[in-house]
From Swiss-Prot:
Protein name, UniProt field: Silaffin-1
Subunit structure: Silaffin-1A peptides form large aggregates via electrostatic interactions due to intermolecular interactions between the negatively charged phosphate groups and the polyamine moieties.
A GO BP entry: biomineral tissue development
Species for this entry: Cylindrotheca fusiformis (Marine diatom)
Disulfide pairings: none
Amino acid sequence: MKLTAIFPLLFTAVGYCAAQSIADLAAANLSTEDSKSAQLISADSSDDASDSSVESVDAASSDVSGSSVESVDVSGSSLESVDVSGSSLESVDDSSEDSEEEELRILSSKKSGSYYSYGTKKSGSYSGYSTKKSASRRILSSKKSGSYSGYSTKKSGSRRILSSKKSGSYSGSKGSKRRILSSKKSGSYSGSKGSKRRNLSSKKSGSYSGSKGSKRRILSSKKSGSYSGSKGSKRRNLSSKKSGSYSGSKGSKRRILSGGLRGSM
């Protein structure tokens, strides 16, 4: 009788222990799976973070390198201005200058009479440079205003071609026009590449094309010479008794001397 009463209690205890162990195992399995999935999710998120960081680094480096390449390309146009500095325009003695008029005098000789014209790739501007000792002439076209400036040293007299109602206006941008009006016969200048400039001191004066390798002829008489604007070319301004007169800006004069002969242009 006692044994028959104990058997149900034993079966009940064994069943409870088995159920509890099964529940514990299931909970342990669920926790391990959750931790593994969490690790996988965190690993995926870390991979995404590493990918995004790599992309951001690549984008920054590409942007920086691209801008540096562009800046190198922009500064590459300054090589021509370095080459331009080799030219020289020697000035005349101060004793022969007029005190009331602004003059620019250029002697034509093998050493000092060389003149170079360059057109940059971006603006097609025309630039003439000379050494520090000589009467320097700089024709600069800036990006903002496209202004024209002619400068010379104090010793050789200054020449400034200003844009006003009387002397004509100049715009440094491509295709713009500059008019230097000394008389009714004076010509026009277009700053774009391949345009023409006419300096008319008489009916026989020639034309000028601002592009590289073009030719400029400043004819004051039948004996005057020719000028080629390409690199390394020379300019000969030959004056004689029959040369004409030229007014560059407000009443100012430019004299181009060749040896003992003097003419005004």
